[in-house]
From Swiss-Prot:
EC number: 2.1.1.56
Species this protein is from: Cryptococcus neoformans var. neoformans serotype D (strain B-3501A) (Filobasidiella neoformans)
Annotated region (Disordered), positions in chain: 1-263, 277-392
Protein name: mRNA cap guanine-N(7) methyltransferase
InterPro entries: mRNA_G-N7_MeTrfase_dom, RG7MT1, SAM-dependent_MTases_sf
Biased composition range(s): Low complexity: 129-144, 220-241
Annotated CDD domains: AdoMet_MTases (cd02440)
Basic and acidic residues bias (residue ranges): 1-10, 52-67
Residues holding S-adenosyl-L-methionine: K442, G461, D483, D512, Q538, Y543
Length: 700
C-alpha cells in the first residue's frame, strides 16, 4: 500500500510501472485477455475481456467500477487524442450511470453506445433500401458491432464526400496530431482532422436516442471534462440535406392514340339542332303571311324549285320513323269537313284565311279555319249538332248541271256497286295475292317519288281510299281525293275518319276529272296553281283515252295544279302486250281463269277510243276500257311541261326492288310473300299482274 496525497488515501502499490505513452501504437487485438499477474497494462484496461452484448451490468460490477484505482487516477488527465474509426472494444463507459445503461426495452446496440460517440448523419436520414438486414447492423451480425468487410462503414467525416464501397481501403493513415495507427486493409478509411471543414457534427448521440434503419456506427470523440470550457462548446449546427432523389419522367408507351368517349357534335348537326329550336320557339317565329282571304285578296303563288335529280333509294324510305312533331289541338277543334265555313258576323279575314299553314297542322284532321279556342267554349250539345254538318261536308257531289256520258255512267255505277268488305273479309278474296302485289307496286312508286316532308297530294281516281295509309307513311300534310263514283268517295271519307291520327288533312270530291276541270269542284283554297307536290292516278288513267278531249283535260288538270319539280305517278295497262293477239284468233279474246280481255276490232284507226272489255275476278265486272298509246301519251305530257323520268313493267319493278333495303322487306310485311318466301299468287294471277306498268313524270 502507498499513500496517495491527491486522494488522501492508501492505494495498492503497483508492481510494474506504466510504460511511456507512445504517439503511435497499434490497436489491440480484438480478444486479448488481461494479464493474470495484475500488471499495470492489465490495470489500465487496455484489453478488456469479451462481454456478452445483450447482458446488462450487475450492481456489483457497477460498484467495483467506481472504486479508486490507479488506472483511473492515471487516465483522468490523459490528453484528447484522435481515436480509430473502429468500434470501441469497451462499449460501456466506466462512468455511465446505471439507469442509462439498463433502460428496459432498449436494443442491444443502444447498451453499447458511449456518450462520446455520434451517429452518422447518413444513417439518420436514409431509410433501408431493401428489406434484408444491412451488413454491420444488429440484426445482421452475431455481435452488435459485427463488421462485414464487403461493405464500407459510413462516417461523419465521409458524409460530405463521395464514397465508393469497391475502392480498396488504406492500411494506415496519419492524424492531425501525428499519431499513427494501423488497421486491417478492409477497415474504413482514416478520418479527417477534427477541425477540417469536411465534417461538422450534427449532434451528440445519447443512449436514449432511437436507432435508425441502419445499424449504429460510432465515431470516437475526445473525452471532455467540465474544467475545459473550450471542449464543452460544439460547432454550430449546419443543416445537411441529402441528395435529391432521381426523377423519372412520365413517358408510358401508349397502346393506341388518345381518344374521348364523348361523341363530337359536327357543324351540320349543330345547324340542324338550331333549326329545330328556332322552329319550336314561338318567340322567334314570324307571323305567317296571308295566303288567301275571302275578302277578295289574292294568295301569293308558291315558288318551288325544280327537282335537280330523281329521288334515289337512299334519299328516303317509304316507312320513315313516325312521331307526332306537331302540337296537338283539342278534339273540339278537329274537323273532317271540306271547305271552311265562316262564322256569321265574323270578319272575312284574319283566322278565316285559307289554306292554313300546312307545316303546322294538327295530327287529327282538317282545320276548319276558326280561331283557336272558340269551339272549346261551346256547349257539348252544339258540338254534336255541328259534327253532323261537318260529316256532310266531307264529300261534295257532282256539280249541278254536270252530265255524265253513257260510258262514264256505266263505270261509275259499276264501282258504286262494289261493296266495302273491309280488311278482314278481303283476305278471303280469290285474287288476294294479286291485290297485295298491286298494293306493293303502288307503295314502291309512292316511296320513290313522294315529296317529303309535309307534301301535298292530289289523288285522281282515289276509289275507296285504299292508298290513304300509304300516303300517311309518306308523312304528307294535305290529301285531296277525287273519283267519279260518289259512293266510293263516301267510303274513302269514312275510312279516313277511322284512321287513328292520320297526321294530314283530307278532302274528298265526287267529280269526273277527265271531262271537266278541277276548278268546278275544288274550293278556292285548294285550286291554287302549282299547289301540289304529287299527282297520282292508279289503275284509272286509261279511262281518259276515250277521246282526245278527255285525254287533254286529264293532262291539263295534272299540269295546272302540279308545281315545278313535282312528280306525276300512275299505273296503266301495257298496250303493247294487249295488242299481241294471235293471228288466227277470230274471237279477239284472251285470258285465263283470273282475267279475260276481249276486243271489238283488231285494228283501230287513230290513237284514241280503241276500247276493249276487261274482266277481273272479284274486281272488275266487264266494263269498257281504252288502250293508252304510249307514244301519244308521252307527247301530250311533253306539251304540258311533263318529262318522263320512270317507266317499268310490274315484273321489272319486282326484279329491281325485291332486294332493296326500303321495299324488299315490304314484300313480307304486306303479305306478298309468306314466312317461307312463297308468293300468294298463282300463275294466272302473275300473268294478270304483268299486263300493267308504272310510270313517273316530272313537271319542268
Amino acid at each position: 500500500m502507498v499513500y496517495d496525497p491527491i486522494r488522501d488515501c492508501d492505494v495498492p502499490a503497483p508492481h510494474i510501472s506504466a510504460p511511456p505513452l507512445s504517439r503511435s501504437r497499434s490497436p489491440p487485438p480484438p480478444h486479448r485477455t488481461p494479464s493474470a499477474s495484475g500488471s499495470l497494462r492489465g490495470l489500465l484496461n487496455d484489453s478488456p475481456p469479451p462481454r456478452e452484448p445483450p447482458r446488462a451490468a450487475s450492481v456489483h460490477e457497477d460498484a467495483e467500477s467506481h472504486r479508486p484505482k490507479l488506472s483511473n487516477i492515471l487516465n483522468d488527465a490523459e490528453p484528447p487524442r484522435q481515436r480509430s474509426m473502429l468500434p470501441p472494444q469497451q462499449p460501456i463507459h466506466a462512468e455511465l450511470e446505471h439507469g442509462r445503461r439498463t433502460s428496459a426495452g432498449s436494443h442491444a446496440a443502444q447498451l453499447a453506445r458511449s456518450p462520446s460517440m455520434s451517429l452518422s448523419p447518413r444513417s439518420q436520414n436514409q431509410s433501408l433500401p431493401y428489406p434484408s438486414s444491412r451488413p454491420g447492423s444488429a440484426a445482421g451480425s452475431a455481435h452488435p458491432f459485427g463488421y462485414d468487410p464487403r461493405q464500407g462503414t459510413l462516417s461523419p467525416v465521409l458524409s460530405a464526400r463521395r464514397t465508393s464501397e469497391d475502392q480498396p481501403r488504406p492500411t494506415s493513415s496519419s492524424s492531425a496530431s501525428g499519431r499513427r495507427y494501423t488497421e486491417p486493409a478492409s477497415q474504413t478509411p482514416a478520418p479527417a482532422p477534427l477541425g477540417s471543414s469536411a465534417y461538422r457534427p450534427r449532434h451528440t448521440s445519447t443512449p436514449g436516442n432511437p436507432s435508425s434503419a441502419y445499424a449504429p456506427r460510432f465515431t470516437p470523440q475526445p473525452t471532455t471534462t467540465p474544467s475545459s470550457p473550450s471542449t464543452s462548446q460544439h460547432t454550430p449546427y449546419t443543416p445537411h440535406h441529402s441528395a435529391p432523389p432521381r426523377i423519372l419522367h412520365y413517358n408510358p408507351h401508349r397502346q393506341s392514340a388518345p381518344s374521348s368517349v364523348l361523341r363530337p357534335i359536327y357543324p351540320d348537326e349543330v345547324a340542324h339542332l338550331r333549326q329545330l329550336a328556332h322552329a319550336n320557339n314561338p318567340l322567334r317565329q314570324k307571323p305567317a303571311a296571308r295566303r288567301y282571304s275571302y275578302s277578295g285578296g289574292r294568295a301569293p303563288e308558291p315558288t318551288p324549285t325544280p327537282r335537280t335529280s330523281l329521288p334515289g333509294e337512299n334519299d328516303h324510305s317509304y316507312f320513315p320513323p313516325q312521331w307526332d312533331d306537331r302540337p296537338s289541338m283539342p278534339p273540339s277543334e278537329v274537323s273532317y269537313g271540306g271547305p271552311p265555313s265562316s262564322t256569321p258576323g265574323a270578319p272575312p279575314s284574319g283566322y278565316s284565311q285559307y289554306p292554313p299553314n300546312w307545316e303546322a297542322q294538327t295530327p287529327g284532321g282538317n282545320w276548319n279555319g276558326e280561331r283557336p279556342g272558340r269551339l272549346g267554349k261551346r256547349r257539348a250539345r252544339d258540338e254534336e249538332d255541328d259534327e253532323y254538318e261537318r260529316n256532310k261536308r266531307v264529300v261534295s257531289g257532282p256539280v249541278a248541271g254536270q252530265a255524265y256520258s253513257k260510258k262514264v255512267t256505266v263505270v261509275a255505277e259499276h264501282y258504286n256497286s262494289r261493296p266495302e268488305v273491309g280488311v278482314e273479309r278481303r283476305e278471303f278474296s280469290p285474287i288476294i295475292g294479286l291485290k297485295k302485289f298491286n298494293n306493293w307496286i303502288k307503295s314502291v312508286l309512292i316511296g320513290k317519288f313522294a315529296y317529303r316532308p309535309r307534301g301535298k297530294v292530289l289523288d285522281v281516281g282515289c276509289g275507296k281510299g285504299g292508298d290513304l295509309n300509304k300516303w300517311k307513311q309518306a308523312r304528307i300534310a294535305l290529301y285531296v281525293g277525287l273519283d267519279v263514283a260518289d259512293q266510293s268517295v263516301q267510303q274513302a271519307a269514312d275510312r279516313y275518319r277511322r284512321m287513328p291520327k292520320p297526321g294530314f288533312d283530307a278532302f274528298f270530291y265526287a267529280h269526273d276529272c277527265f271531262s271537266n276541270p278541277l276548278s268546278d269542284v275544288l274550293s278556292p283554297e285548294l285550286q291554287i296553281k302549282d299547289l301540289y307536290d304529287n299527282v297520282t292516278m292508279q289503275f284509272c288513267m286509261h279511262y281518259a283515252f276515250e277521246n282526245a278531249a278527255k285525254a287533254r283535260m286529264m293532262i291539263e288538270n295534272v299540269s295546272r295544279y302540279l308545281r315545278r319539280g313535282g312528280i306525276f305517278i300512275g299505273t296503266i295497262p301495257n298496250a303493247e302486250l294487249l295488242l299481241q293477239l294471235p293471228d288466227r284468233d277470230e274471237e279477239l279474246r284472251f285470258g285465263n281463269s283470273c282475267y279475260s280481255i276481249q276486243f271489238t276490232e283488231r285494228r283501230h284507226k287513230g290513237v284514241y277510243g280503241h276500247d276493249y272489255r276487261f274482266y277481273l275476278t272479284d274486281a272488275v265486272e266487264d266494263v269498257p276500257e281504252y288502250l293508252v298509246d304510249w307514244e301519244n301519251f308521252v307527247s301530250l305530257a311533253s306539251e304540258s311541261g311533263l318529262r318522263l323520268v320512270y317507266k317499268k313493267a310490274f315484273h321489272e319493278i319486282l326484279q329491281e326492288e325485291k332486294d332493296s333495303r326500303d321495299f324488299g322487306p315490304l314484300l313480307g310485311k304486306m303479305g306478298v310473300l309468306n314466312e317461307y318466301g312463297e308468293s300468294a299468287m298463282d300463275a294466272d294471277q302473275w300473268e294478270a299482274a304483268n299486263l300493267y306498268m308504272g310510270f313517273a313524270f316530272e313537271k319542268m
